Every structure is written in structure tokens, then in C-alpha cells.
Amino acid sequence: VLPAVSKEECYAYRIVEQVCPEIADMTLLCMPFPMIKDAQKLELAHKRIYDAVEDYLRQGLRVGMLTIGDPGIYSTYMYMHRCAADAGWEARIVSGVPSFCAVAARLGISLGEKNEEIHIIPAAYDVRESLGFHGTRIYMKSGKKLEELLRVLREAMQDKESRVHQDIYGISNCGMENEQVYCGLDELE
């Protein structure tokens, strides 16, 4: 299963293809997962995708799903995992490298040391509450909300009462040929 419209548009496939060329000879099921917040529409989409996956399982075939990062962190895989497990199929999670760990390695920085806290925040939602968190704040999956996130961060840095030293980094497509690295709010904007 590729969570994309086509194998050409699937980053995970393009990465695996480089180290495992025989994947090109395998049956591929391209199933784009919608990135929407409407719970009812999302559930219907997941059911439709899982039904297609289960058709293969009923034929006695083994099914795998490629994702970027770790399947346990904001991953489309977990929806399929739960559906398969609930239906009585064996479902296994193979850990990957979380994107924020890859980013920290790429930047040569530590996410947390000694008693420092690390917070992972889904940036597609309201992030204001997270401004009070101490330690490292990792905003993931900002997508269409990036401008809003940057505005909130800029306002927080201008507020004299809450101003503390903050290093702000951003990376898109970490480790890929189209990787972009940003240091500071000015570069991100």
C-alpha cells in the first residue's frame, strides 16, 4: 500500500526503490489518505481504503504499507493497523526514524538533554497553548497552517513577558534532494 495517488508521487516508494529495486515488480495499491479534520469523512475514507487492503488479505496475500518516518507518530499507517487488528488479522509495526529525529541529526542539534522536556505538537491545530511549554517544542505537519504557526510564534517572541531565547528551525523534505533548511523566523517567512 502506498499512501499516495501514484508511486511516482510517493516519497516512501522512491526511497525504498533505491535500495530494493524489486519493489517495482510487486503489486502496488496506491491509496491517497485524505488530510482532513472532518471525523466522519475521514472514517469513511479510512474504511474505503481498508476494505481495498482487506480484499488482498482475504486472497491470502501479505500486505505492507510504506510510510515516511515512524508509523507510530502521526502516521496514516496506524488507521490501517487498527482496522486489520480489529478484524483479526496479524498486524505488525516496523519502527522507522521519526522525522524530528532526522531533522535534529541533519541540523547537528540535540532535542533534549538532562531534564529538558520535549513536546511534539500537531501544528495543524491551535498551537497557542503550547507556547507555555518548557523545553523543546516540535511542531509537525503544519502544512496549510504554517503561516498561522509563524504568526503565533512571532507574536510570542515580541511579547516582552514571555520572551525567552528560542532557536527556531524548519526543514522540509529532510534528507531528500529537494530538502530546504530554514534558521529563524525570518527565513521561514
Question: Residues of each region from the PLM?
Answer:
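Class I S-adenosyl-L-methionine
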Residues: 1-89
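A contiguous loop/helix-start segment that scaffolds small-molecule binding in enzyme catalytic cores
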Residues: 2-5, 15, 131-189
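Short gly/pro/ser/thr-enriched loop/turn and capping motifs at secondary-structure boundaries
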Residues: 7-9, 36, 98-101, 176-178
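Conserved beta-strand scaffold positions in the cores of enzyme catalytic domains, especially
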Residues: 25-30, 91, 120, 168-170
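A polyampholytic, Gly/Pro-enriched intrinsically disordered region
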Residues: 46-55, 110-122, 187-189
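Residue-level preference for the first positions of well-ordered beta-strands
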Residues: 60-66, 117, 136-138, 167
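Class I SAM-dependent methyltransferase SAM-binding "motif I" and its flanking Rossmann-like core
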Residues: 72-133
